[in-house]
Design a protein with these regions (language model features):
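Extended beta-solenoid/beta-helix repeat architectures
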Residues: 1-213
Length: 213
């Protein structure tokens, strides 16, 4: 049986079910769990069930009362998820509010709030002042946003705990960092650093405790 395409350009709702392509340029509400090959949101979506798709693109606004799962996720608009985002490849350039992000590769260049934890193979962050409780990954890169001659005054992202294989960070505040290899720029402040491999540290006077194991 062929899957149905759904397009909402005015105001409407989508019932529980399996779909091929879902396009929303108006105002839409889902009335249950939906699965789809593609979900594209340039309007407004209120999902009252879980959403699972091979590809999700949000350039408008979307709120999800349950988990949202996508093979490929691209956000240039606004997304609010009550619990968890699961993705293969996630590029978050808009505004995202959620508790947990899980993925293979997660890139955040926008605004992220309410996030307790990011778990991924790779994490790439290009953000300013943000608080995230925990990062867990093989590879982590943290870049400060470009801001001309004044980028040094940017408030850096803050983390309670980072656990990874290797990390390269231009600037951050972290209570506990455990890794194998690290490359830490001069705008990093760390309370406790534990590493077992190679360390390039430009901010030694801003690290309270260093433990090479």
């Amino acid at each position: 049986m062929d899957l149905q395409d759904i397009t909402i350009s005015g105001s409407g709702s989508i019932g529980k079910g399996n779909y091929k392509e879902v396009k929303i340029s108006g105002s839409c509400k889902t009335l249950g769990d939906i699965t789809a090959e593609t979900v594209k949101i340039s309007g407004s979506l209120k999902a009252e069930g879980a959403v699972k798709a091979e590809e999700v693109k949000v350039s408008g606004s979307a709120s999800f009362s349950k988990d949202m799962e996508a093979g490929e996720l691209k956000v240039s608009g606004s997304v609010k998820v009550e619990d968890k985002i699961k993705c293969g490849q996630g590029v978050l350039n808009g505004s995202v509010k959620c508790k947990i992000i899980e993925g293979e590769s997660v890139t955040v260049n926008g605004i992220i709030t309410g996030c307790e934890e990011i778990n991924a193979d790779e994490i790439h962050l290009g953000i300013g002042r943000t608080y995230i409780n925990q990062l867990h990954a093989d590879h982590i890169e943290i870049r400060l946003p470009a801001h001309g001659l004044f980028w040094r005054s940017f408030e850096v992202p803050e983390f309670d705990e980072i656990d990874c294989t290797d990390i390269k960070a231009e600037g951050m505040k972290c209570k506990k960092l455990c890794c194998k290899d690290c490359d830490l720029g001069e705008f990093c402040e760390i309370e406790y650093l534990e590493y077992s491999g190679i360390a390039n540290i430009q901010c030694k006077n801003k690290i309270k405790n260093i433990n090479k194991i």
